[in-house]
Amino acid sequence: MSEQQIDWDLALIQKYNYSGPRYTSYPTALEFSEDFEDAAFLQAVARYPERPLSLYVHIPFCHKLCYFCGCNKIVTRQQHKADQYLDALEQEIRHRAPLFADRHVSQLHWGGGTPTYLNKAQISRLMTLLRENFHFNTDAEISIEVDPREIELDVLDHLRAEGFNRLSMGVQDFNKEVQRLVNREQDEEFIFALLNHARDIGFTSTNIDLIYGLPKQTPESFAFTLKRVTELNPDRLSVFNYAHLPTLFAAQRKIKDADLPSAQQKLDILQETIVSLTQAGYQFIGMDHFARPDDELAVAQREGVLHRNFQGYTTQGDTDLLGMGVSAISMIGDGYMQNQKELKRYYQQVDERGNALWRGITLTRDDCIRRDVIKALICNFRLDFNAVEQQWGLHFAEYFAEDLQLLSPLAKDGLVDISEKGIQVTAKGRLLIRNICMCFDAYLRQKARMQQFSRVI
C-alpha cells in the first residue's frame, strides 16, 4: 500500500461517522480532575528528569472575533492588556522554570488567540524572559501561529531575528463570501507575500490551516481554495472539520445553520481535498494533516516514529511538554495538567501561588499502556504486539481481549488487518482512525459520552 493512499469508501465513512475523541491525549481532557494538586505536578516533573523539554505559551488576545472559533481567546484592541498578561506570564515562568533547571528546550510554540497580537517590544520581552529562564538547544524548533490580517512583513523579520524558525498561518478559506460570513476577510496577495518572505528570510517550515464545513462553502468553491493553497506550496497543511456548536461557543451563533454545507457536501469537500492534495504531492499524515514527502513528519511516519500531543503531530516524542499561560495544557511525566482557563482566575492564582494549575490527571499503568497503543495507531497506522508486550510485560491478546473483540467488526469491514503479530490500518481505515482507536479507550466503555465529541469526519 502506498504511504499516502486512502481508499474512499462512502458507505463505510457514513456508517462510522459518529462522534469520538481526537486523541491529542489519552485519557482525554474529560478525565482531568480539579483534585490534581501541586504535589502531583512536582511528582510528574521528577518522573523522567532526563527528558528534553517542549514549551507552549498561550497568547489569548485577538483584535477581531472569527465566528467559527472555539479557542480560548479574548477579543480586545486595548494593547496594554497584553502588558498586564506578560506581567503574569513572567511570574509563572519564574515560578516554573527552576523545576526544569537541568532540562534543555528542544521545542517552543506560541499559540492563541493570536500570538502576533503582541507588538515587537512585547515579543522581545517574552522571548528574552524565556531565554533567561530556560536552556534552549541551538537547533530548537521555535514556532508561532500567525494571523495574516494582523501582521506586517517587518514583524516577520523581527520574529526571525528573535529565533523563530517555523510558521503556521490560519487561512481557513480563500473564498470572499465565506470569509465575510465568518468575519475573517483577508488579502490573498499578502498571504502569498507573507509566506514567500518567510521562506526568503530563513523560516525552515511553513504550515497553512484550512477549515471545511464553513457557511456557503461548496465543493466547487473549496476547490478554488485548494488550487490556491497548492500554489502557495507550504510544507504542511492542516484541514480541520468545522464543528458547529453554538450552545458551547457564543460566536458561532452568528453563523446561520441554513448557510452551512450539508453532511454530504462536507464529505464531498473532504474527498476533493484528499484527492487534490495527494495529487499535488502531499502525503496524508492522518486526522487532518498533510505534509510534503520530504517533510520530517512524513519521514517520521514512514519510519514508524511519529508522535502526537496537544499541539498535534510531532517528531519529538520523548519530551515533556510544559504549557504556560491561561488555559495551557502540559504533558509531564505520566501526567497531564491544565492551567486556569478564565483570565481573571489565572491572574489571581498566579499572583497568590506563582502558578495557575487548575486540573489534571496522573495516569495509571493501564492508562499508559493504552496511551501507547492509541498513539502508535493514530501516528503510524500500525501496531506491533511484541513491542507492547516487551515494554509492558503483558500478553497482548489476553490483556486486550475485550478491545480486540470490539475491533473485530471493523476488521470485517476492512478498516484493519489483524494478525498474530499486530494491527495494520488499511487504506479504507486511515480516514476512520479515530473509530479504530476508540476500541482501545477504556473510558468510553465506562461512560456514555459520545455526544461530547465532534464527528470523526
UniProtKB/Swiss-Prot annotation:
Cofactor note: Binds 1 [4Fe-4S] cluster. The cluster is coordinated with 3 cysteines and an exchangeable S-adenosyl-L-methionine.
Protein's cellular compartments: Cytoplasm
Function: Involved in the heme biosynthesis. Catalyzes the anaerobic oxidative decarboxylation of propionate groups of rings A and B of coproporphyrinogen III to yield the vinyl groups in protoporphyrinogen IX.
One Gene Ontology cellular component: cytoplasm
Keywords: 4Fe-4S, Cytoplasm, Iron, Iron-sulfur, Metal-binding, Oxidoreductase, Porphyrin biosynthesis, S-adenosyl-L-methionine
Reactions this protein catalyses: coproporphyrinogen III + 2 S-adenosyl-L-methionine = protoporphyrinogen IX + 2 5'-deoxyadenosine + 2 L-methionine + 2 CO2
Family assignment from sequence similarity: Belongs to the anaerobic coproporphyrinogen-III oxidase family.
Disruption phenotype: Cells lacking this gene accumulate coproporphyrinogen III under anaerobic conditions.
Identification of the protein by name: Oxygen-independent coproporphyrinogen III oxidase
Binding site for S-adenosyl-L-methionine 1: 56, 112, 145, 329
Cofactor (UniProt): [4Fe-4S] cluster
Main location per the UniProt record: cytoplasm
Enzyme Commission no: 1.3.98.3
Subunit structure: Monomer.
Positions annotated to bind [4Fe-4S] cluster: 62, 66, 69
Pathway(s) where this gene product acts: Porphyrin-containing compound metabolism; protoporphyrin-IX biosynthesis; protoporphyrinogen-IX from coproporphyrinogen-III (AdoMet route): step 1/1
This protein's encoding gene: hemN
Domain annotation Radical SAM core: ranges: 47-280
Residues that coordinate or bind S-adenosyl-L-methionine 2: 68, 113-114, 172, 184, 209, 243
A biological process from GO: protoporphyrinogen IX biosynthetic process
